[in-house]
Regions:
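Acidic-glycine-rich active-site phosphate/pyrophosphate-binding loop
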Residues: 22-36
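C-terminal binding/interaction regions
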Residues: 2-6, 19, 72-90
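Phosphate-handling active-site elements
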Residues: 62-74
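N-terminal acidic leader/helix
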Residues: 13, 17-21
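Thiamine diphosphate
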Residues: 1, 9, 25
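A short glycine/serine-rich beta->alpha loop
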Residues: 37-47, 90
Length: 90
């Protein structure tokens, strides 16, 4: 998965101007983002997981513009998802 993901991010990054931000995903952010996707996929309709991660990414960009570091913004997005996602009974 990591090789494919890195290739994908690199291919997208090549389409951006050199002045644009890097699309590299720091290792310490991968697990929280995957956890967000898992929580949403298992607590709601599965189709919400990729949409939630997209919206979370936009949230992180907006919070970064406000001076909040990425790790904090990802944690905020994850906590919000946890708070509003119903837990399914086993």
């Amino acid at each position: 998965m990591d090789d494919w993901f890195e290739k994908y991010a690199e291919a997208l990054e090549k389409r951006l101007d050199s002045s644009e931000a890097s699309l590299h995903l720091p290792g310490h952010l991968k697990n929280p983002i995957l956890t967000l996707a898992r929580i949403v996929a298992h607590g709601t309709e599965r189709k919400n997981a990729p949409l939630a991660t997209y919206v979370a990414g936009r949230y992180v960009v907006a919070r970064d513009a406000q001076g909040v570091d990425e790790a904090t913004a990802v944690t905020e997005a994850l906590k919000i998802a946890e708070a509003i996602t119903p837990t399914r009974e086993s």
